[in-house]
Amino acid sequence: MVERLTRQLLAFQLAAVLAVAASVRFGLHYGWHTALGIAFLVLVAVRMGISINNFVLAWQYRSDTPREYRLNAWLFLRMFCMEFLASMWTTSWAMPFKRFANAPVNKSERLPVLLIHGYGCNSGYWHRMRRPFDDAGIVYRAIDLEPVFADIEAYGPLVAQAVEALCRESGQDRVIIVAHSMGGLAARAYLRQCGNQQIARVITLGSPHHGTGIANFGAGMNCRQMHWRGNAKTGAPSIWLRKLDESEDQATRELFVSIYSHQDNIVAPQISSQLAGARNIAFRGIGHVALALHPVIHACVLDEIRAAWALPLPEKASHAEQPITEN
């Protein structure tokens, strides 16, 4: 579905560029090259305005940034440009044309990796991470979370099916999950429903473990489940997130590594990505979409995967529970 929608969005943008170019060409009597250039700049300005709006909204819900993670004006501008380019690349190329969900995998002597994307994305989001994984000899699989606006609990069975398939095809009895944004919550929903017997590690990138104020402006049941109401100090997560938090024991939390940025422009408060009992790793100067595209994050994820490969088998596993409702 996301693949189709992003292709339709590209077609609409192309039509808009041609319409603006024609208006400039015949209304202002510029040449076609100039008219097309102006039309393209208009498109870039609109897309950049969307990115600016995300940062403005995130600022309203921001958490305090530790001194060592603060940015000067130049570093912030560089981060904004990187996030804008990451968003353009992801929505205009990776998600429309590079989807690779459920691709078959080979047998592996080491634990394989399951990639879970976030809200409004598909498996194409992970395209830039494929080369580092291939170079490291990692066997991996990605899934698409659909329906796009569904209850996050409904993604649990999709994750379960992918885990079973990945174990069967790789010949391993456990997997490592790497999840971006809402994908981390889908992984937590899966663990609550199915237990952690088949999971060696969960590495989340910019996941709103306690919600995000930006979700208040989004559509779908999954957005409502990711709500954060109020400011960073006095606000509160959704009922669903609170119940999810209460359902997890220490053994489950110890499986998690939460990687996040203090300048995340979608997850705000940014410290919402911190998960008690987990290993929390903070970065600065990286936006939300850029997390899975940045070489520094690639290196960190690879380090955590290699660390999970060296872990001994768990002594105790948690058991499955019933899905959480908002009642």
Q: What is each model feature region?
A:
Residues 28, 192-327:
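Helical cap/lid subdomain of alpha/beta-hydrolase-fold lipid enzymes
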